[in-house]
Swiss-Prot record:
The gene is Dnajb1. GO terms for cellular component: cytosol; nucleolus; nucleoplasm. Interacts with DNAJC3. Interacts with HSF1 (via transactivation domain); this interaction results in the inhibition of heat shock- and HSF1-induced transcriptional activity during the attenuation and recovery phase period of the heat shock response. Interacts with BAG3. It is found in: Cytoplasm; Nucleus; Nucleus, Nucleolus. GO terms for biological process: cellular response to heat; chaperone cofactor-dependent protein refolding; negative regulation of inclusion body assembly; negative regulation of transcription by RNA polymerase II; protein folding. Residues 2-70 form the J domain. InterPro entries: DnaJ_C, DnaJ_domain, DnaJ_domain_CS, DnaJ_subfamily_B, HSP40/DnaJ_pept-bd, J_dom_sf. It comes from Mus musculus (Mouse). Interacts with HSP70 and can stimulate its ATPase activity. Stimulates the association between HSC70 and HIP. Negatively regulates heat shock-induced HSF1 transcriptional activity during the attenuation and recovery phase period of the heat shock response. Stimulates ATP hydrolysis and the folding of unfolded proteins mediated by HSPA1A/B (in vitro). The lineage of its organism: Eukaryota, Metazoa, Chordata, Craniata, Vertebrata. Induction: By heat shock. GO terms for molecular function: ATPase activator activity; ATPase binding; Hsp70 protein binding; protein folding chaperone; transcription corepressor activity; transcription regulator inhibitor activity; unfolded protein binding. This is DnaJ homolog subfamily B member 1. Its main location: cytoplasm.
């Protein structure tokens, strides 16, 4: 079952914008790592940020209300992405920094610094009560004076948010031939006034080269969320192999599990081995085949990443299926002919 963003924020469906803001403020303050040191607080803080990112955006919220998390992230019944080598994937992914969102919500300030910075945090204070009387939303603290001296006018050096990583799942056929993936992202961008923020969609194009190995990283610099006090994070896609219904991958080799009977293992057989490009290669075996034994078909695997004109091997891995029982007459014959 997918995430329920309303449940994450403790809201009922149909909550108003103000209720969503209040819920985010309450939950974010409760689980902020500067305040909450319990295990899992950091992950909960990220989930709260993602929930607010969706429910505070009318378009994302409408899709989520209709189709749930699966529909929002690309699997809605209204139309899935193409599965072909040049297929286009459209999906929402949260790639913002929850700490940057928190700071933006409170007008670029850290409320924990204001209230707790000179008092070592005072873990016992009730965060909800502390902030309940203050305005919410982006910039809610901007014009409030809490008795501290004004900071110097020297500009604060911006820091880049940490990289945001997403999996890029590809099939073995796509690795064999190479393909183009188009990923639609939604990120926040700073308007020309240098203060207000807009949501912006962008298509990131990834040229998957033949033979790329699992774990290959593709980086799009500074495509994360942008605010007035950060440098956007890099968006990093990490190549992951989709599970295949026939083959397994081992580097540039492709493993084909062949199931044969005990009679075939002892007496020899011909195995029709499929390939990634749709051909079938008949391979004859005359010797005894032991369970788990491997035989290679050279040059029928995946392209080598650095020299794609060369290819790895197709490896046949045998699984011998033993009979549940043997008739007495057959057992007698086997005892006579099989070596001890």
């Amino acid at each position: 079952m997918g995430k329920d963003y309303y449940q994450t924020l403790g809201l009922a469906r149909g909550a108003s914008d103000d209720e969503i803001k209040r819920a985010y403020r309450r939950q974010a303050l409760r689980y902020h790592p500067d305040k909450n040191k319990e295990p899992g607080a950091e992950e909960k803080f990220k989930e709260i940020a993602e929930a607010y990112d969706v429910l505070s955006d009318p378009r994302k919220r409408e899709i989520f209300d209709r189709y749930g998390e699966e529909g929002l992230k690309g699997g809605s019944p209204s139309g899935g992405s193409s599965g072909g080598a040049n297929g286009t994937s459209f999906s929402y992914t949260f790639h913002g920094d929850p700490h940057a969102m928190f700071a933006e919500f409170f007008g670029g300030r850290n409320p924990f610094d204001t209230f707790f910075g000179q008092r070592n945090g005072e873990e016992g204070m009730d965060i909800d009560d502390t902030f309940s009387s203050f305005p919410m939303g982006m910039g809610g603290f901007t014009n409030m004076n809490f008795g501290r001296s004004r900071p110097s006018q020297e500009p604060t050096r911006k820091k880049q948010d940490p990289p945001v990583t997403h999996d890029l799942r590809v099939s073995l056929e796509e690795i064999y031939s190479g393909c183009t993936k188009k990923m639609k992202i939604s990120h926040k961008r700073l308007n020309p006034d240098g203060k207000s923020i807009r949501n912006e969609d962008k298509i990131l194009t990834i040229e998957v080269k033949r033979g790329w190995k699992e774990g290959t990283k593709i980086t799009f610099p500074k495509e994360g969320d942008q605010t007035s006090n950060n440098i956007p994070a890099d968006i990093v896609f990490v190549l992951k192999d989709k599970p295949h219904n026939i083959f397994k991958r081992d580097g540039s080799d492709v493993i084909y599990p062949a199931r044969i009977s005990l009679r075939e293992a002892l007496c020899g057989c011909t195995v029709n081995v499929p390939t990634l490009d749709g051909r079938t290669i008949p391979v004859v075996f005359k010797d005894v085949i032991r369970p788990g034994m491997r035989r290679k078909v050279p040059g029928e695997g995946l392209p080598l990443p650095k020299t794609p004109e060369k290819r790895g091997d197709l490896v046949i891995e045998f699984e011998v299926i033993f009979p549940e029982r043997i008739p007495v007459s057959s057992r007698t014959i086997l005892e006579q002919v099989l070596p001890i």
